[in-house]
């Protein structure tokens, strides 16, 4: 892709296990609302703040993200964290993007409003806040008073519809043999069943197709 000195890059960093329509809608809404040139999805290698018993292999999460965004020319996926060993820190990734484009881009960082409430626990959070513009996605009716006044002055609030979709629920539904159609793109659904992700071997792929 081509980034000019006037360009703005939005950076959406998550586990994506799996990526779903909630992620995609939020990214597209941010691109349109803030007039961004592109959205870069960055699957984490080893998430620091989201310790789960197990997450899918990085390559699976990367390929599902590639499939999910393939029909949107404004979306791309980066392996910047997957290629870097050890825990994934946002500050390292943002700095790497800035160096890559000779500091000629403005980076927007999409996160949920609840996640931003924990920003002070992030590694080098004060420096991170200075390097990029945060976009905090909220649901209708979200109590903005939960955000510190200081935070409200440094972030942009973006309200999105209450899409009740979560990666955790999708994994659970696959384990229980329930349908995930219309929660994830068809290509991602197909990939999950083909690679037997999130389920016991005895569960059939009866919901595919």
Q: What positions do the PLM features span?
A:
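N-terminal beta1-alpha1 ligand-phosphate binding loop
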Residues: 12-36, 40-47
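Classical nucleotidyltransferase
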Residues: 60-63, 77-209
């Amino acid at each position: 892709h081509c980034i000019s000195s006037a360009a703005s890059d939005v950076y959406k960093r998550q586990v994506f296990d799996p990526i779903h329509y909630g992620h995609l809608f939020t990214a597209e809404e941010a691109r349109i609302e803030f007039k961004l040139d592109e959205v870069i999805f960055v699957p984490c290698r080893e998430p620091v703040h989201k310790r789960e018993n197990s997450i899918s292999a990085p390559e699976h999460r990367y390929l599902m993200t590639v499939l999910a965004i393939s029909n949107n020319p404004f979306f791309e996926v980066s392996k910047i964290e997957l290629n870097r060993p050890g825990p994934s820190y946002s500050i390292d990734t943002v700095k790497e993007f800035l160096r890559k484009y000779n500091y000629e881009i403005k980076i927007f960082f999409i996160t949920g409003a609840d996640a931003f409430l924990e920003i002070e626990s992030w590694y080098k959070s004060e420096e991170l806040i200075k390097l990029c513009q945060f976009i905090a996605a909220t649901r209708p009716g979200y109590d903005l008073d939960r955000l510190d006044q200081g935070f409200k002055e440094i972030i942009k609030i973006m309200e999105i519809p209450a899409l009740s979709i979560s990666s955790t629920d999708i994994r659970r539904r696959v384990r229980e043999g329930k349908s995930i159609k219309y929660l994830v793109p068809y290509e991602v659904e197909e990939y999950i069943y083909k690679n037997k992700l999130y389920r016991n071997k005895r569960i059939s792929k009866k919901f595919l197709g």
